[in-house]
Amino acid sequence: MLIVVTGPPGAGKSSYIRAHARPVDIVIDLALMALAMAGPGADHHDHHPVLLRVVHRARQAAIHEAERHLDQVDVYLIHTMPQAKARAHYKRLNARIITVDPGEHIVRQRVRDMRQPAMEAVVTRWYRDRRKGGSRPVTRQSSRAW
């Protein structure tokens, strides 16, 4: 089964997957992929544009291949803000959509703590889209200790 985990930056999408995925499951997480492909000592969130380009291509290839094995393993895919085309594709695959949203105040504090000001715009867009009728929270997660 395909499990698509959505939510704003800093919501706890990776934590949700760590709590639910089994060792045999496939996890496609752009942030983890970037960290795995970056050089030693790389920042966990601030990556060079060339690295991100490579990681995005690798992510697409991983998604394409993983979709061929949904009858054998569960595939956890982080997709922060899937647009209509992606949501329709996930629906055709009978994906389960999980939205992780601990609340805007908590998310904004986590993004500030990560010192990633560029993510503030993504958080704003995510909540704006949600208020317009986009994704609805399925999972409320309390704040976690870092």
Residue ranges of each PLM-predicted region?
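Active-site signature of alpha/beta-hydrolase-fold catalytic machinery across serine-
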Residues: 19
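Conserved glycine(s) of the Walker
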Residues: 7-13
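Conserved nucleotide-sensing/catalytic segment adjacent to the nucleotide-binding pocket
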Residues: 22-92
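Hydrophobic positions on the alpha1 helix immediately C-terminal to the Walker A/P-loop
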Residues: 16
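Short hydrophobic/aromatic beta-strand immediately N-terminal to the Walker A/P-loop
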Residues: 2-4
